[in-house]
UniProtKB/Swiss-Prot annotation:
Name of the protein described by the UniProt record: CCA-adding enzyme
Gene: cca
Enzyme superclass (EC): transferase
Positions that bind ATP: 55, 58, 141, 161, 170
Binding site for CTP: 55, 58, 141, 161, 170
Species of provenance: Haloarcula marismortui (strain ATCC 43049 / DSM 3752 / JCM 8966 / VKM B-1809)
Subunit details: Homodimer.
Record family assignment: Belongs to the tRNA nucleotidyltransferase/poly(A) polymerase family. Archaeal CCA-adding enzyme subfamily.
Additional facts recorded: A single active site specifically recognizes both ATP and CTP and is responsible for their addition.
A biological-process GO annotation: RNA repair
Function description: Catalyzes the addition and repair of the essential 3'-terminal CCA sequence in tRNAs without using a nucleic acid template. Adds these three nucleotides in the order of C, C, and A to the tRNA nucleotide-73, using CTP and ATP as substrates and producing inorganic pyrophosphate. tRNA 3'-terminal CCA addition is required both for tRNA processing and repair. Also involved in tRNA surveillance by mediating tandem CCA addition to generate a CCACCA at the 3' terminus of unstable tRNAs. While stable tRNAs receive only 3'-terminal CCA, unstable tRNAs are marked with CCACCA and rapidly degraded.
Catalytic reaction annotation: a tRNA precursor + 2 CTP + ATP = a tRNA with a 3' CCA end + 3 diphosphate; a tRNA with a 3' CCA end + 2 CTP + ATP = a tRNA with a 3' CCACCA end + 3 diphosphate
Binding-site list for Mg(2+): 67, 69, 118
Enzyme Commission number(s) from the entry: 2.7.7.72
Length: 466
């Protein structure tokens, strides 16, 4: 089995390694971007250092990647407003057709000769514990890994990244909530190679804590904790979801048991057509309800947390009302979970919140229990509240409690989701505003209309894989 595993990894290693021409071309573009940034800095009233960061700087990028990350490091003495002003000035000078995006502060993204370029301002702090913004850590990450990676370990990292991409858990964006490049590199170094990493993962019992430099003292409530060797108060795996940890464990065991190249290849399911959706809904015998609306004008890393919060709020309230949610999901049009292309933004896209009900309809009345009769003050209040209410049955005593049977506000999940009551469930702020602008409710086989635009999402939903 070892020979078979090594043969598979050898093929992937060769495929994932950029050619000499790829390396030279990317570095030529990176050098040109950095030179232009240095020229733009010369016109500013402050000095700054330009550094290349990320996987392309560390030699751990995989063949076909076309991303260049350049940071402009300003003195910590300037204030945040000046950092943003100077950073955007350099960004727009270097990338005149670029656009601004926002994380903790704005930066410029654009394109140079077919390469996606991020030009990000940060503070040139002495060490990562003195950071003033989250991105200030990045140059420290690059230096830390450059000192520890050699050609062989970099190749092992590329294999690991290709595997994580193949099983759909690579990327620290808030849609994926997977493994970042930096986290992947630390894990491969920690265990000494790709196979050793998989063997360790296969036996993990989360929560798992790793501390590469043995200097962390903070406690984190995450399934995987990897103490940042440049900042002992940070968990590098903080974004990583419990589901993605479990997914990695599943496929680590799978690959070790049956080595094959196919696990290293991203494979979106064949999109469902409308007829496929109708057949799936009919076969399951459930009641799916979809809310479709225009996405708010925010970047995906702001959109996805709000979608999850909104789904959680809706599911909790519907469960409380007796409507059993079997499963739920959020879809964003033109978003397959891969990093956004340069022309992909939230504006102009549709969003779907899908809730599938095992129980979608309830009788007209519901049971409402009061306190035990022996809890005199509360029991008396409950009795008096309903005693003269002709719209309820009771109060009567069942066991030791007062009980009434009262009319339900909503007898169907669809009725609730079509009403103003949805705004009382703790929706994400921007999702609430988007719904207030109007939304469409699709029920049962009518959700087949979503196949045009969400076919891959629906295929993944109705035919789920680990």
């Amino acid at each position: 089995m070892s020979d078979e595993f090594d043969a598979v990894v050898g093929k992937v290693r060769a495929r994932a390694s950029p050619t000499d021409d790829e390396r030279a071309q990317l570095q030529r573009v990176a050098d040109a971007v950095m030179a232009d940034a240095e020229a733009a800095i010369a016109d500013l009233p402050v000095e700054a250092e330009v550094v290349q960061v990320g996987s392309t700087a560390r030699g751990t990028w995989t063949a076909g990647d076309r991303d260049v990350d350049v940071f402009v490091c300003f003195p910590p003495s300037i204030d945040r407003e000046a950092l943003e002003e100077y950073g955007l000035a350099v960004g727009h000078d270097v990338l005149p057709d670029g656009r601004e995006e926002y994380a903790e502060h704005p930066y410029v993204v654009g394109e140079r000769e077919g390469y996606a370029v991020d030009l990000v301002p940060c503070y040139a702090v002495e060490n990562a514990t003195e950071i003033q913004s989250a991105v200030d850590r990045t140059p420290f990450h690059t230096r830390y890994l450059q000192e520890r990676l050699d050609d062989n370990s970099a190749a092992e990292v590329r294999v690991a990244k290709q595997f994580l991409k193949g099983i759909g858990v690579y990327g620290s964006d808030l849609r994926t909530r997977g493994f970042s490049g930096y986290l992947t590199e630390l894990l491969v170094l920690e265990f000494g190679g790709f196979r050793a990493f998989l063997e360790a993962v296969a036996d993990w019992h989360p929560p798992v804590r790793l501390d590469p430099d043995d200097h962390g003292s903070e406690t984190f409530d995450d399934p995987l904790v990897v103490i940042d060797p440049t900042d002992p108060e940070r968990n590098v795996a903080a974004v990583l979801s419990e589901t993605n940890v479990a997914t990695l464990q599943h496929y680590a065991r799978d690959l070790l048991a049956e080595p094959r190249v196919s696990l290293f290849t991203e494979d979106d399911p064949c999109p469902f057509e409308a007829a496929d959706v109708e057949a799936a809904v009919s076969q399951r015998g459930t009641t799916p309800v979809a809310l479709r609306f225009a996405a708010p004008d925010v970047v995906d890393d702001q959109l996805w947390p709000q979608l999850r919060k909104s789904l959680d709020g809706l599911c909790s309230e519907l469960d409380r009302r007796g409507f059993e949610v079997l499963r739920s999901a959020a879809f964003v049009e033109d978003d397959s979970g891969k990093p956004e292309t340069l022309d992909t933004e939230s504006r102009g896209r549709d969003v779907v919140l899908l809730l599938e009900f095992a129980v979608a309809e309830q009788p007209a009345v519901e049971r409402h229990e009061g306190p035990p009769v022996h809890v005199r003050e509360h029991a008396s209040g409950f009795f008096q509240k309903y005693d003269d209410n002709s719209e309820v049955a009771g109060p009567f005593i069942d066991g030791d409690r007062y009980v009434v049977e009262r009319q339900r506000a909503f007898t169907t999940a669809t009725g609730f989701l079509s009403s103003a009551a949805v705004y009382d469930v703790g929706l994400g702020q921007r999702i609430e505003s988007a719904l207030e602008n109007g939304y469409e409710v699709l029920v049962g086989t009518d959700i087949a209309a979503l196949a045009d635009g969400f076919g891959v999402d629906l295929a993944s939903y109705f035919d789920p894989k680990p």
